[in-house]
């Protein structure tokens, strides 16, 4: 079953997904600029999350990008920064959430170690290792359940 949900992004009718086989649930959230209550409710109870961690705020601010692009990426309809993604993770965390993939990392405005640092507090404990998707090669298959 696929359950699409809307997100705040500067595209026409942007949607993300909650996928389920009836027993297990995967939430996919990328290309969102800010947190909405509908987004959080759509991701509740997932066994696995693929979560955008697009940029580090400081790296984006200090980047060579023009001011207009920085404003777009970091704005309400742009992309999720590491700290906002950590807030989403904390809001969606429950005992059954076993798998987390950080995805859509900017090659210019983020680093895997910054993502790990931002998500560490919420993701601590007896869960599977945090997987960080490589912007070029993705990540290996993960068995959910």
PLM regions and their residue ranges:
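Cap/insert and terminal regions of metallo-dependent hydrolase folds
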Residues: 37-134
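Class I S-adenosyl-L-methionine
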Residues: 131-143
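Core dinuclear metal-dependent hydrolase active-site scaffold
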Residues: 1-48, 141-145
């Amino acid at each position: 079953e696929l359950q699409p949900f809307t997100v705040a992004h500067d595209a026409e009718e942007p949607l993300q997904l909650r996928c389920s086989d009836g027993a297990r649930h995967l939430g996919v959230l990328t290309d969102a600029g800010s947190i909405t209550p509908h987004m959080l409710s759509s991701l509740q109870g997932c066994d696995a999350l693929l979560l955008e961690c697009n940029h580090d705020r400081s790296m984006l601010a200090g980047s060579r990008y023009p001011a207009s692009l920085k404003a777009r990426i970091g704005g309400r309809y742009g992309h999720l920064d590491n700290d906002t993604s950590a807030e989403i993770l904390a809001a969606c965390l429950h005992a059954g959430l076993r798998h987390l993939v950080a995805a859509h990392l900017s090659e210019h405005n983020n680093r895997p170690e910054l993502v790990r640092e931002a998500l560490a507090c919420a993701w601590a404990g007896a869960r599977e290792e945090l997987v960080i998707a490589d912007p070029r090669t993705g990540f290996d298959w993960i068995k959910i359940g």
